[in-house]
Structures are given as C-alpha cells and as structure tokens.
C-alpha cells in the first residue's frame, strides 16, 4: 500500500520547525498568498468599489476535466472575509465541462475581487493535477496497477497537489522525506552498498521507534537479488524497459525468503508479497505496457511538475 500520511512525524536530526497539521499548512499557504498578492490592499478595487457594495460571483468552468479544490476555495473566502457566503453546486472529483457553474459566492464586492485570483490559482492548479491524474489512471483500467505521484511538486503546494492526485483517482507516494524510507543510488553509494544501507535503515527505525516502509531503488538483476535478500517492503525498478520490467516482476514474484528471516524481520517478504514500483521516464503512452507487466505502482512526476491548469473564470452574476 502507499505510504501513510503522518503529519506528526519528524526526526530528531531535523533543523526545521516540527511538522504542522494539514489545516496549519493550508493556512500558512493562504497567508503567504494574500501577502504577495493583496499586500496592504487592492489599489484598483479600493479606489473604484464602495466599501458597502454587495454582489455575487460564480465560478464558471471553461474546459473539460476533473474539478478539485472546492473546499480549499472555501477556506480562501473564509480567511479573507468570514461573512462571504459560498453555495456549492459541484463538488471535488466531479467530471466537469465548459459552462458548468461550480459555486456562487456572495458578499462584499471588495472581498470577492481581492480573493478572486488566489482562489483561481489554487482551483486551476488542483483541477489540472486531478485531470492529468484521471487521464493516467484511466489508461490502467482493468489492471491492479496504481499511479503514484512524486515529490516533484510546487513549493508550498505539495499538500494540495497530492490531495488533487487522490481526487483524480491516483494514489500518493510518500508525502515528504519523513514518512517513508526510500533508499536510492546515492544513499547506497554513501552507505557502502545495498545490504549496509538497508540494515542501517532498519536499525535507525528500531532505535527511533519508527514504523516506516522501506523501499529500495534498483537498476539491474543483481541489485534486485540484493534487495530481496536484505528484506525490503517495496522495490523500485528505475528506468527499466517494459521487457526488463516483465522479467524483473517474474523474478521477484518467484523469490522465497528464508523462514527464519520471515519470522524475525517485518520488512522481509516472499516475492509475491513485495510491492513493485516502476519509475523513470514513463509517459502516458507507455504507461499501460508497464502496468501489464504486473507492477503494483507506477510513479509519474508529470502529474504535478508538468501539468496545465484547468481553465475557469470567476464572474459577476
């Protein structure tokens, strides 16, 4: 299964602030968004719109896709002006088309105009991510394989982009560096090898009371064998072709772990129980070929780093 979200997890070696809750992270993002956009006030709106002017605006969808971010939009309005009233007609996860009205907001016109761009930036971004994810996951219809996101996200918006991936039907990989151990080539090189890196990870988890999945990135059959013998929860096949992936999946599934190791090491599994992830250069056109190899997950950075926002507007009504 994908790494679980643990917002309270942080290592004693960290030199940043302790992890914040979901709501705190969103509030911090909105505080920054208002600071950089509104500043000490919208000069145009404050100079042209009377303070007591009341009105309504509606969010109009202009492109087909998956709607995401409605509840975050509500937080935008509530944070700026708690008296704004939002009436929702289309919720997160819905398939939308041009002309659909997702919600109507009424209240002070000054508040509507000053929250418009921040709300649209978030909604367009999240809906774009959800729409892209839906397109990828749809290519895997009928297969067990799940599309995963990555850490290639917009700084400050990771939480929202990963929520959008789930809204679009995908699954989340680790949220950050804190909620899963993913041993990559650099870790292996610095640790002195795969057995050393995996054992060090297990020792660290035990010493620090961490119950984290351990995943290992591999590049060839020899590294697959070392991963299986070391005992890991998931193996990432990095930049394998579909042909090599099929061979690797068959090889992993046939592995039988020693009974003593199975009994003593919770990260040790028979090959049929090891999660397998494909990663590296996989496009929407090659996605299904990898899924048909029988992998459990395919991680795709493009879900968040190369996405186009879904077109929509916020107009007076």
Regions found by a protein language model. Give the residues of each.
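Intrinsically disordered, low-complexity segments enriched in serine/proline and basic residues
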Residues: 258-272
